[in-house]
């Protein structure tokens, strides 16, 4: 566990955003961890190919231990609310480098699974991030192969919190668009104090929402890209 993370307590149908980040209150200088030029360590596995057709798996969290993230001007305590595993294709990736949100959640990944990974659908699907932590989904064509509702329930924008410096480096340098990935960890809520002001984070717990607050906030403990596993 990195030095700034400590456990607290015992162990063309239209364009819409799929979600918005959890209402930034302050903007502060950013601290990014991970050594310059240092490669992420991984283990090569003989696991079967990544199946991106199934829905994400979400179970009650086996622990509610708080995870404290120390920031330049305060802290945020994360509370796991669900164990989460998602196998998907990376549609878009964005790194953030300013504000307390970037200190806590430096990466956003827009992920798709199910029919959205099929070539006939993927070629008609446009997904991109903007600088407000939204992921925009657009389906092209007068008769798209899937409904907009299907696209909204088989794609998600994920605010990633790497649990280790190695995972930070892996997400930063090794994850790219069109990669097939498996991400495991915990969906978390958060509350903290920054420059005397209370800040809060709340994760989505369903894949059916598509508005503000619909992002998954994911504390990442394991990442697989192809046959490589990072922790």
Pin down the residues of each PLM region.
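Bacterial N-terminal signal peptides
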Residues: 24-32
């Amino acid at each position: 566990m990195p030095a700034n993370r400590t456990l607290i307590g015992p162990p063309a149908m239209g364009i819409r955003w799929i979600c918005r980040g959890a209402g930034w209150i302050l903007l502060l200088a950013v601290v990014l961890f991970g050594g310059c030029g240092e490669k992420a360590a991984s283990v090569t596995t003989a696991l079967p190919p990544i199946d991106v057709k199934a829905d994400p798996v979400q179970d009650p969290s086996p622990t509610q231990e708080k995870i404290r993230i120390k920031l330049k001007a305060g802290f945020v305590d994360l509370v796991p609310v669900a164990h989460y595993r998602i196998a998907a294709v990376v549609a878009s990736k964005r790194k953030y480098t300013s504000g307390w949100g970037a200190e806590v959640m430096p990466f956003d990944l827009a992920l798709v699974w199910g029919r959205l990974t099929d070539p006939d659908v993927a070629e008609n699907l446009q997904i991109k991030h903007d600088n407000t932590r939204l992921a925009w989904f657009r389906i092209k064509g007068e008769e798209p192969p899937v409904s907009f509702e299907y696209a909204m329930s088989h794609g998600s924008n994920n605010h990633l919190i790497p649990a280790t410096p190695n995972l930070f480096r892996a997400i930063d340098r090794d994850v790219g668009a069109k990669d097939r990935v498996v991400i495991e960890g915990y969906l978390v809520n958060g509350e903290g104090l920054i420059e005397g002001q209370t800040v809060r984070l709340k994760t989505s717990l369903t894949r059916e929402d598509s508005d503000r607050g619909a992002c998954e906030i994911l504390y990442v403990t394991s990442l697989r890209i192809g046959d490589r596993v990072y922790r």
